[in-house]
Amino acid sequence: MPLYQDEGVVLRTAKLGEADRILTLLTRDHGKVRAVAKGVRRTKSRFGGRLEPFMRVALLIAEGRSLDVVSQAESIAAYAGPICADFQAYTAANVICETADKLVATEKEPAVAQYRLVLGALNALAKHAHEPSTIGDSYVLRALAIAGWTPRLRVCVVCGEPISSALSWYFSIPAGGLMCAADHTPESEAVSWDAICRLSALVDGDWGELDGVPASASIQRETHQIVEEWGEYYLERPIRSMRLLD
């Protein structure tokens, strides 16, 4: 079987037979790859714990007819340890990996920007750089933005009215962003000015803004609900892990 080298992050695993696992990987050069890790569930597996979710690994993979086969794996960054030791970080990491798995639908198609975003988010969680749920929310919005679904947060999506704290604003997920009071539709929801500012910072990855003035619990709930609904609408299925970030 032809061999290829790459590096990747383990998004999820599934048991196969008595000792094997099917890995879903997001790789730097080959995009999403599904591969079998033979014997990985045995106590004395040569892979050790290198092929667990959230691990970044250098890989040698053999191409197969239906599934590829992992021949070698070496750890690059052991994100799993510090992430799994913190429940909130673990939950956010599951959101990230579930979203990446659903968003990158086609296998063996390069998705470099998505790969780099996943690495940055997992690295931030492992280092406890920011509040875990905020990392998760920011990742979801930025990953969807890379895919072409960026919420419009600076003007009304109907008339182009620039946003202002002096006006009332509504958010419509089907319409793709903010609506002014004159043009908002029945399905749109009123959104607070603080939530608009937080959503903008989440999309931009503006950690100076996000860390500088901590949002109240109510604003965090308001923005998290929008992020969850935005992800579900554009992925056309729920991000189930997000419910644990509430």
Swiss-Prot record:
Q: Which family does it belong to?
A: Belongs to the RecO family.
What NCBIfam families has UniProt attached to this entry?
A: reco
- Kindly give the PANTHER family that the UniProt entry links to this protein: DNA REPAIR PROTEIN RECO
Protein name in the entry: DNA repair protein RecO
Role description: Involved in DNA repair and RecF pathway recombination.
A single cellular component GO annotation: bacterial nucleoid
Q: Which UniProt keywords apply?
A: DNA damage, DNA recombination, DNA repair
Q: Which HAMAP family match?
A: RecO
One Pfam family linked to the record: RecO_N
Question: What's one GO BP annotation on this UniProt entry?
Answer: double-strand break repair
- UniProt lineage: Bacteria, Bacillati, Actinomycetota, Actinomycetes, Bifidobacteriales
The answer to whether keyword DNA repair applies is yes
